[in-house]
Swiss-Prot record:
This is Neuroligin-1. Residues 46-717 are extracellular. It is linked to Autism 20: A complex multifactorial, pervasive developmental disorder characterized by impairments in reciprocal social interaction and communication, restricted and stereotyped patterns of interests and activities, and the presence of developmental abnormalities by 3 years of age. Most individuals with autism also manifest moderate intellectual disability. The transmission pattern of AUTS20 is consistent with autosomal dominant inheritance. One of its GO terms (biological process) is neuron projection development. Residues 194-206 have a biased composition (Acidic residues). Expressed in the blood vessel walls (at protein level). Highly expressed in brain through prenatal stages, and at lower levels in pancreas islet beta cells. Glycans are attached at N109, N323, N363, N567, S703, S706. GO terms for cellular component: asymmetric, glutamatergic, excitatory synapse; cell surface; dendrite; dendritic spine; excitatory synapse; filopodium tip; GABA-ergic synapse; glutamatergic synapse. PROSITE patterns: CARBOXYLESTERASE_B_2. Keywords: Autism, Autism spectrum disorder, Biological rhythms, Cell adhesion, Cell membrane, Disease variant, Disulfide bond, Glycoprotein, Membrane, Secreted, Signal, Synapse, Transmembrane, Transmembrane helix. Residues 739-863 are cytoplasmic. The gene is NLGN1. InterPro entries: AB_hydrolase_fold, CarbesteraseB, Carboxylesterase_B_CS, Neuroligin/BSAL, Nlgn. It is a single-pass type I membrane protein.
Length: 863
């Protein structure tokens, strides 16, 4: 018997069919259908009451609060704050996946924020280095949001718009006297005429007129260590974009990501919290007027990397309202963070778990007993411990557990695990501001010695290896030296900022976009070039890490707030409206250009430049991206030279180092107990000309480009590698020809053919080793395998997976038990192939200590 088709959304009919299947057809069909239709139709029957907003969810009724916004163009928003999406992860539930919340019978007031998840607070204030730039001079206000801490913290906040701003604006432009138009109205007479003349349907948001609204779930950043969704008010974005916005609290730090590397504590509880929040959203958002088939996750910094990781997890599949091709969400926006950065994944979880256990008196060999001991400790004792990770890495964060994250993120991306999601991602122009601020003592720029030290320390921590480190160090210095203005301290500061930005953010984002677009999946890339003018950040700073967040949330449209104390201009308001339109369009259709066009006539009488720009999809070939700033334009190949330095050249230099070990003088590795930093103010800068002092003058520091150091130059290494390879190929060819000729005359005259090698022929063995590093198997998967002479082609090096080396922790082999389930990359033993952004195999070989250590105890990267 076919069911009559009504005009209800598809997901309601899916709910009806699912109910029929679940209950079976044994009961009278009429009663079964009636019960199912009533259950599914209840989703549509609930219209929010502005006076008493009450919603009945699957777990009980909740009451929200209506909030007016400080802008005439923005309609009121109904807020539901502190809504539980999981049971409290306390007691035995600590270090366990979340469970659904218990239902409640009374009406629950959702008018106040719930407690935030436990996090480390130093003297009542969050560590400055971990926060976005606009928070650094307002820490007292920020810290007030995280004072109320509890392990019972798994709550979310829902912001529901009450009016369609775009529809109201057009209606008021046509008929200003209508009751729906508030006194004074948002539009001038000229603007009214402009909008009245444009009567086309292209300005109408057809898909959202009266139907379920798209949903945007925001994941906050904070290096997986601090922060809360309570900090981010989604009201303006919800009202202006006509979408439902949700912010989430999830477990952080030790409580959210501790892993013993086995079944005792698998880790990734914070990610599982986010998955549970998405599951709750998928099953309940219909009661708030939301569309469970149009859920977009977005986040900045570590929140962006969480977004990326969620697209790679099979736990994100299984939306009850959809078919098998739809998951808990359908689209993703990763702002200034992907799963390929050095700080995105912890590859040493068991080591840090042991360190924590030792500090709190739980240092037992059995991991089950260790976890039981940690479960009995007060949470404050755990989160306050000083666990120092390697620089540019994290101690407690997502791990490759073979389950939530089944493999290295780059491998999962190559396998197309995220191809079913539409993805938008991007970076800010000057993400690495905080790293540079820790080096700069004044506004005068960076001295040559500080520049040399910063680069050396960077290489030591991320690419340190015993031999040939100088090659990589000097190459990076060379590439990030502005040779037209190399003596200018301000120029050095600018290039150093670019170095940190390119390595930690830009190159991982481009690599992620390349991998996603390779499958033909919709990919959009942006570069954010604007920040508000304020005295709280240096005048020389570009758009820093997190500077896009207030524009995404629409803060400029309501003026300065205590969290965003900036004097926003009309340009800021216009740009925020543009960004919100792009973001919400993407949430609605997967295309940031549709369905709502760029129109900010309520701010400026003249059209903005974004009206003439079409944001083109990204592809690996063209690498088109949108320059978001006051002068927008679509450009191609963002920072291509520097990106390919990290993705292509650096891995080759790492492999060439293995070759140079056979051909250059071996330098003894400095003792791990000896660390130093150059202290002389008049040391010769790396960009200066050749020194005129005698080389035997101990007071004169030789230039890194001196003749006696040319053994370490890239050119010489390449020359030696290619020359040795060609020589050996010639030897092989000559030997094969001679052997063939000799074999013909074998019956007549036996002659001894030259031997390829002997057991004690060290020189020739070295040549064979060199050759093995220069040949490439002609297989499509580009992996270094066994090489046969008839299958080889000459090349400079065998490039490893360029992202696998990017995140490798610089410490020694992780502490893993025999029943380990955490999947450490299989290239750790022996010579490690280079991950583009992190390959150091021995963290204790750092030759230079950082002069400005980070104050936070768990993470050294502000994301």
């Amino acid at each position: 018997m076919a069911l009559p088709r009504c005009t209800w959304p598809n997901y309601v009919w899916r709910a009806v069919m699912a109910c029929l299947v679940h209950r079976g057809l044994g009961a009278p069909l009429t009663l079964c259908m009636l019960g199912c239709l009533l259950q599914a139709g209840h989703v549509l029957s609930q219209k929010l009451d502005d006076v008493d907003p009450l919603v009945a969810t699957n777990f009980g009724k909740i009451r929200g609060i209506k909030k007016e916004l400080n802008n005439e163009i923005l309609g009121p928003v109904i807020q539901f704050l502190g809504v539980p999406y999981a049971a409290p992860p306390t007691g035995e539930r600590r270090f366990q996946p979340p469970e659904p919340p218990s239902p409640w019978s009374d009406i629950r007031n959702a008018t106040q924020f719930a407690p935030v998840c436990p996090q480390n607070i130093i003297d009542g204030r969050l560590p400055e280095v971990m926060l976005p730039v606009w928070f650094t001079n307002n820490l007292d206000v920020v810290s007030s949001y995280v004072q109320d801490q509890s392990e019972d913290c798994l709550y979310l906040n829902i912001y529901v718009p009450t009016e369609d701003v775009k529809r109201i604006s057009k209606e008021c432009a046509r008929k200003p006297g209508k009751k729906i138009c508030r006194k004074g109205g948002p539009l001038t007479k000229k603007q009214t005429d402009d909008l009245g003349d444009n009567d086309g349907a292209e300005d109408e948001d057809i898909r959202d007129s009266g139907g379920p609204k798209p949903v945007m779930v925001y994941i906050h950043g904070g290096s997986y260590m601090e922060g809360t969704g309570n900090l981010y008010d989604g009201s303006v974005l919800a009202s202006y974009g006509n979408v439902i916005v949700i912010t989430v609290n999830y477990r952080l730090g030790v409580l959210g990501f501790l892993s013993t590397g086995d079944q005792a504590a698998k880790g990734n509880y914070g990610l599982l919290d986010l998955i549970q929040a998405l599951r709750w959203t998928s099953e309940n958002i219909g009661f708030f007027g939301g569309d469970p088939l149009r859920i977009t996750v977005f986040g900045s910094g570590a929140g962006g990397s969480c977004v990326n990781l969620l697209t790679l997890s099979h736990y994100s599949e299984g939306n009850r309202w959809s078919n098998s091709t739809k998951g808990l969400f359908q689209r993703a926006i990763a702002q200034s963070g992907t799963a390929l950065s050095s700080w995105a994944v912890s590859f040493q979880p068991a080591k840090y778990a042991r360190m924590l256990a030792t500090k709190v008196g739980c240092n037992v060999s059995d991991t089950v007993e260790l976890v039981e001991c940690l479960q009995k400790k007060p949470y404050k004792e755990l989160v306050d411990q000083d666990i120092q990770p390697a620089r540019y890495h994290i101690a407690f964060g997502p791990v490759i557990d073979g389950d939530v994250i089944p493999d290295d993120p780059q491998i999962l991306m190559e396998q197309g695990e995220f191809l079913n999601y539409d993805i938008m991602l991007g970076v800010n122009q000057g993400e690495g501001l905080k790293f540079v601020e820790n080096i700069v003592d004044s506004d005068d720029g960076i001295s040559a010695s500080d520049f040399d030290f910063a680069v050396s320390n960077f290489v030591d921590n991320l690419y340190g290896y015993p031999e040939g480190k100088d090659v990589l160090r000097e190459t990076i210095k060379f590439m990030y030296t502005d040779w037209a203005d190399r003596h200018n301290p301000e120029t050095r500061r600018k290039t150093l900022l670019a170095l940190f930005t390119d390595h930690q953010w830009v190159a991982p984002a481009v690599a992620t976009a390349d991998l996603h677009s390779n499958f033909g999946s919709p990919t959009y890339f942006y570069a954010f070039y604007h920040h508000c003018q304020t005295d709280q950040v240096p005048a020389w700073a570009d758009a820093a890490h997190g500077d896009e967040v207030p524009y995404v949330l629409g803060i400029p449209m309501i003026g300065p707030t205590e969290l965003f104390p900036c004097n926003f201009s009309k340009n800021d308001v216009m740009l925020s409206a543009v960004v919100m339109t792009y973001w919400t369009n993407f949430a609605k259709t997967g295309d940031p250009n549709q369905p709502v066009p760029q129109d900010t006539k309520f701010i400026h009488t003249k059209p903005n430049r974004f009206e003439e720009v079409a944001w083109t999809r990204y592809s690996q070939k063209d690498q088109l991206y949108l320059h978001i700033g006051l002068k927008p334009r679509v450009k191609e190949h963002y920072r291509a030279n520097k990106v390919n330095l990290w993705l292509e050249l650096v891995p080759h230099l790492h492999n060439l180092n293995d070759i140079s070990q056979y051909t250059s003088t071996t330098t003894k590795v400095p003792s791990t107990d000896i660390t130093f930093r150059p202290t002389r103010k008049n040391s010769v800068p790396v960009t200066s000309a050749f020194p005129t002092a005698k080389q035997d003058d101990p007071k004169q520091q030789p230039s890194p480009f001196s003749v006696d150091q040319r053994d370490y130059s890239t050119e010489l290494s390449v020359t030696i590698a290619v020359g040795a390879s060609l020589l050996f190929l010639n030897i092989l060819a000559f030997a094969a020809l001679y052997y063939k000729k000799d074999k013909r005359r074998h019956d007549v005259h036996r002659r001894c053919s030259p031997q390829r090698t002997t057991t004690n022929d060290l020189t020739h063995a070295q040549e064979e080793e060199i050759m093995s590093l220069q040949m490439k198997h002609t297989d499509l998967d580009h992996e270094c395998e066994s090489i046969h002479p008839h299958e080889v082609v000459l090349r400079t090096a065998c490039p490893p997976d360029y992202t696998l080396a990017m995140r490798r922790s610089p410490d020694d082999v992780p502490l893993m038990t025999p029943n380990t389930i955490t999947m450490i990359p299989n290239t750790i033993p022996g010579i490690q192939p280079l991950h583009t952004f992190n390959t150091f195999t021995g963290g204790q070989n750092n030759t230079l200590p950082h002069p400005h250590p980070h104050p936070h105890s768990h993470s050294t990267t502000r994301v």
